[in-house]
Amino acid sequence: MSEYVVDTSVVIKWVVGEPETALALALRQHRLSAPDLLVAECANILWKKVRRNELTGDQAVFAARLLDRADIELVPARGLMEAATSLAVALDHPAYDCLYLSLSERSGRPLVTADTRLLKKLGTTPAGIYSGRVIDLRAM
């Protein structure tokens, strides 16, 4: 069993049919962790899907219940904030995503993401410093 950090772009696919849902579900056989920010981000995505008429309120609440029971080690964001802020400034990228990067660096576990904006940003870093540490879900 491998160990990974996963972000919201991966976890939300467990409960909402999206491209790469099967790949995201396959990750559940591994040991997974994420900053506790994941909970708020998933809830917000579910709310947005209700607002866009992509889910009913009942479906969103049911999806939230399933995610709340998911086997993911939630790590307090508080201990990641300084490193995440430093990464956000260095990368000129939102600190929310950098919390996941920070946890990946601290734990030594690769980050798996489907966030194309983050992947594009990291692809422009000097000498591919994130190569192998950040994995595109589509490459799993």
Segment roles from a protein language model:
Residues 37, 43-83:
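Active-site-proximal, substrate-binding regions of enzyme catalytic domains
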Residues 10, 16, 39, 44-47, ...:
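Hydrophobic side chains within alpha-helical segments
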Residues 72-120:
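Active-site neighborhoods of divalent-metal-dependent phosphate/nucleic-acid chemistry enzymes
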Residues 1-37, 52-61:
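Short, well-structured N-terminal submotif of metal-dependent ribonuclease cores
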